Amino acid sequence: HTNDRRQRQMCIRDSLSLAQVDVDNLLSVRANFCSARVNYRRQRGGGKGQMIAKAVGLSSSTAPNVFDATAGLGGDAFVLASLGCPVTMTERVPEVHALLTDGLCLAHEWGSENDQSLVAILKRMALVGSDAAKYMQTIEDAKKPEVVYLDPMFPQRTKSARVKKEMQVFHQLIAKDSDANLLLQIALECAQKRVVVKRPRIAPYLAGLEPNYKLEGKSNRYDVYLCH
């Protein structure tokens, strides 16, 4: 169904996609864990030397369990799972939650027939619900994650063609995460070892809270808050 933001969900080639209908083009996104791009990153993406791996504390001997409170299409969770981390995910936007559920199911089906290593990765990923704040507040102390990972939506600064298509679609679907500051506070109380916040490189600190340290790339950075 098309709503006032001209968004709709539609089936394309037997997979669920979210589409933005414009006058000149059609942008669509889906959760795809079987693409050549995803496989390339699995094989040659830098392994445990990637910034996200360093940010969560992954090492040759340690693969922490991670709670991804803002899973989106599952891209970062998949990277961490491919490196050995058990990842529990939540995604609160119903349309995006549906895309992620569909993508995981299709990947399991495809992997069962074509790639058992993909199945092994997917077994380390669990989508448990939609409300991250409530979920974190109900976790028993003994089962709290070592790492909580946050990638809150941030204001779109440009409408240029360089903006990733999924961001164009998502920004039309949902507004800036107005409760991201609260989510950080809950995450700090939930995580056993650290909270990692992914941010645009030049964005202010979430909730104005300076991290213990940060890792910076060309466009993004990871703010790391250590829990004591």
Please describe what each predicted stretch is.
Residues 1-12:
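Single conserved hydrophobic/aromatic residue that forms the stacking wall/gate
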Residues 27-60:
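SAM-dependent Rossmann-like transferase core, predominantly class I methyltransferases
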Residues 61-72:
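Conserved class I S-adenosyl-L-methionine
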Residues 64, 146, 193:
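Conserved acidic residues
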Residues 73-85:
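Conserved SAM-binding loop of SAM-dependent methyltransferases across substrates and taxa
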Residues 90-147:
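S-adenosyl-L-methionine
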Residues 152-183:
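Mobile active-site "lid"/loop adjacent to the S-adenosyl-L-methionine
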Residues 180-226:
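Conserved Class I SAM-dependent methyltransferase catalytic core
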